[in-house]
Design a protein with these regions (language model features):
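Tryptophan-centric aromatic hotspots in well-structured domains and transmembrane helices
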Residues: 58-59, 127, 166-167
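Short hydrophobic/aromatic patch on the recognition helix
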Residues: 49-59
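Short, basic, alpha-helical segments at the C-terminal edge of helix-turn-helix-like DNA-binding modules
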Residues: 70-77
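Hydrophobic alpha-helical connector segments
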Residues: 78-104, 157
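Amphipathic alpha-helical segments used for helix-helix packing
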Residues: 69-70, 101-122
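C-terminal peripheral helix-coil segments that are non-catalytic and often amphipathic
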Residues: 1-8, 92, 99, 133-141, ...
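Amphipathic alpha-helical packing segments from all-alpha helical-bundle domains
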Residues: 100, 104, 120-145, 155-156
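Basic, helix-initiating cap at the start of DNA-binding domains
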Residues: 1-34, 38-47, 64
Length: 194
């Protein structure tokens, strides 16, 4: 099992951002051609132009590297805009979430977290929960603005909304298309709006 400690202190020099970027880019590039199980730190290091020791020193394992690469990508794309209209914000996040999860990187992470409980726990803690909290804040804003029913169970409502995305990608192996996302969002909004 992996020891995925998010508060790790790394000995030695701080990470070189150019090398970090090269390693993450190499990881994403190689995942287009190789299954995660067949991807090695040696291959990533060669593609990135760094030593294997650099990768092991910074991440400890390819699973840790995979998760951090996914998080880095998701942090750029799967972001709530608390100022946007409610429906637009949910749609943007669902579209971006679908794209990220359906990418070679996302599919590799899905495979890895289904096989590694520690990695799943880290995914939940570092990706899923922060976005769920942001979505809950968005619902709270809708309630405060008088747009959404005050008596909704936000956890259940968010499970209903995002469950379709995760179900399709994790279990059916397909991403939702824009038309399906629109249908889901329309039904979702009808159920929670005043």
């Amino acid at each position: 099992m992996n020891n995925l400690n998010t508060n790790m202190t790394h000995a030695g020099r701080p990470r070189d951002e150019a090398a970090k970027s090269a390693i993450m880019t190499a990881t994403m590039t190689l995942l287009k051609d190789f299954k995660f199980a067949n991807l090695t730190i040696e291959r990533i290091a060669k593609e990135a132009g760094v030593g294997k020791a650099t990768i092991y020193r910074w991440w400890g394992s390819k699973e840790n590297l995979l998760l951090e690469t996914f998080l880095d990508t998701a942090d750029d794309h799967v972001v709530f805009n608390q100022e946007a209209p409610l429906l637009d914000d949910f749609k943007q996040v669902i579209v971006e979430l679908t794209v990220v999860l359906d990418s070679a990187l996302g599919r590799a992470l899905i495979t890895a977290i289904l096989e590694d409980r520690d990695l799943l726990d880290q995914f939940h803690q570092r990706f899923f929960e922060p976005r769920r909290q942001q979505a809950s804040q968005l619902l709270r804003r809708g309630i405060d603005d008088g747009l959404i029913k005050a008596d909704i169970n936000s956890d259940m409502v968010l499970d209903m909304l995002f469950g379709d995305v995760y179900m399709n990608v994790f279990f059916y192996g397909k991403a939702l298309d824009t038309a399906s996302i629109d249908v889901i969002l329309t039904s979702f909004m009808k159920g929670i709006m005043i």
